[in-house]
Curated annotation (Swiss-Prot):
Acetyl-CoA binds at residues 379, 385-386, 404, 422, 439. Residues 251-460 are annotated as: N-acetyltransferase. The gene is glmU. Its main location: cytoplasm. Residues 1-229 are annotated as: Pyrophosphorylase. Its EC number is 2.7.7.23, 2.3.1.157. UDP-N-acetyl-alpha-D-glucosamine binds at residues 8-11, 22, 72, 77-78, 139, 154, 169, 227, 332, 350, 365, 376. GO terms for molecular function: glucosamine-1-phosphate N-acetyltransferase activity; magnesium ion binding; UDP-N-acetylglucosamine diphosphorylase activity. InterPro entries: Bifunctional_GlmU, GlmU-like, GlmU_C_LbH, Hexapep, NTP_transferase_dom, Nucleotide-diphossugar_trans, Trimer_LpxA-like_sf. The keyword Metal-binding applies. This is Bifunctional protein GlmU. Homotrimer.
Amino acid sequence: MKNYAIILAAGKGTRMNSGLPKVLHKVSGLSMLEHVLKSVSALAPQKQLTVIGHQAEQVRAVLGDQLLTVVQEEQLGTGHAVMMAEEELSGLEGQTLVIAGDTPLIRGESLKALLDYHIREKNVATILTANAKDPFGYGRIIRNAAGEVVNIVEQKDANEAEQEVKEINTGTYIFDNKRLFEALKHLTTDNAQGEYYLTDVISIFKASQEKVGAYLLKDFDESLGVNDRLALAQAEVIMQERINKQHMLNGVTLQNPAATYIESSVEIAPDVLIEANVTLKGQTRIGSRSVITNGSYILDSRLGEGVVVSQSVIEGSVLADGVTVGPYAHIRPDSQLDECVHIGNFVEVKGSHLGANTKAGHLTYLGNAEIGSEVNIGAGSITVNYDGQRKYQTVIGDHAFIGSHSTLIAPVEVGENALTAAGSTIAQSVPADSVAIGRSRQVVKEGYAKRLPHHPDQPQ
């Protein structure tokens, strides 16, 4: 039997008060829609459609060209949204999942369990339900004395007794595909909202004595639908708990999980120590035995084994085994630090390659530089790489020694084993094994200070 899927992503999300479509708001680095698509993939649907409407082009851009979309020009309810898929799916044999694109916490395993239950029970429709402590706002699952599902009643249409029901509709269903589209033809807008409710399909099936079931979620959190920023923050907290728990089970030490932000795309090897207030985002990969200390931020970077990052920012860069960074360093995009490089406090590296065992300990800027192995960069040294229009490269050979407060004006090259004297401005290349001194000769005027206003011998 074939599986199909319809993801509902056409809503405006008015309560988000945002210029961004609701389903594109992110939870742990991925849009809500991407989380849903990832979970839906567990069913391996033969055909999958996403119903888009509000700011359709933005949503389509996230989906890419590989996934089918249909446009709901007017948002006339969930039933109307599913009707938009009729041309693609009507008449096909199989089961169809219908799920909202603003439910980022639903797990693929739960959707698979829902499908298995639907097939096993031979239902024409199966509702994914959950027990809510506070069911306000949700559609209620109404059962008869035998425990069979009779109806789904929306909050605005529920009477007092129905509002006391704790079992709620999560908005996720499995339908017999052919019967779904047959039933949709009988929907009306005779309700408090004046919309086509998808839930009315259940009443249609019950009226024709077809079997409708409900599969109860074990974890209510999975049912969370995000309609405002409060729910978005709630989803973020829950997702972070999941992500951090899995990393800890995999052998990562998080000193304070509640104060550690790790996006879902990040990979961390066992025996890594992550201190509090650390943020790890994007395609970051961290090797075993590395230590990331309090307050560090790492984005789209690959760190080898035994790397230590102390209160620093690393973006779009590659750090080999044994590299140490910080405190208060900034490794900017397109930088590569080879084995055992040391970047100390208040050092900024941008678009540069530093060879093995090279050290830049203090107060340094290295931009657009190709630096060899075992080079020492003295405190306060700067590569001057930008003339206001173009950027130029600085090349420093192996074993070179750059004296403190050297200014290297690119394009310039310092050869292997060469040395620049402290305080030098280097505007011409320095050959290998040479010493370059580029500073004014010191002049001492003995006794002259006594003539200056600051001197204690001067009258005040």
